[in-house]
């Protein structure tokens, strides 16, 4: 099976969402009569203000697969609480054999992250973050691990509510 790693492409549609295609794989199904070729596309969509979603689409042709992936990503969007263009706190994410470490960074640091993780942060609108991946570098697993870490983000107000304290007590 051949694999095509597509260049990350960005799109800005009229709905204000940022779209990035992370990868397109050529897949093959072997049947009695021969091989059936198809394509699988992986995309991320975000609003530049903390909302992000991932989608995977499969079809016989690339444009159809990408369109399906974009639509699925739009349906799967969720909000991540950001603080001044970076994350609230350091967090680990895991999916399959991929593990990622996501850490907030000071202003001026930029997005220090590899491939698929960078695409997620770009569409989300994160300006400063440090991310490190361990284990599998499969784009699908890396994106899922990154989103797992982002879902674990919590604000000081969330933590204060869980502990039954005020935000001032939590922040010291």
Curated annotation (Swiss-Prot):
Lineage: Bacteria, Pseudomonadati, Pseudomonadota, Betaproteobacteria, Burkholderiales
Free-text function comment from the UniProt entry: With S4 and S12 plays an important role in translational accuracy. Located at the back of the 30S subunit body where it stabilizes the conformation of the head with respect to the body.
Record's protein name: Small ribosomal subunit protein uS5
Keyword rRNA-binding: yes
Subunit (UniProt): Part of the 30S ribosomal subunit. Contacts proteins S4 and S8.
Keyword RNA-binding listed: yes
GO molecular function per UniProt: rRNA binding; structural constituent of ribosome
Organism field: Paraburkholderia phymatum (strain DSM 17167 / CIP 108236 / LMG 21445 / STM815)
Similarity comment text for this entry: Belongs to the universal ribosomal protein uS5 family.
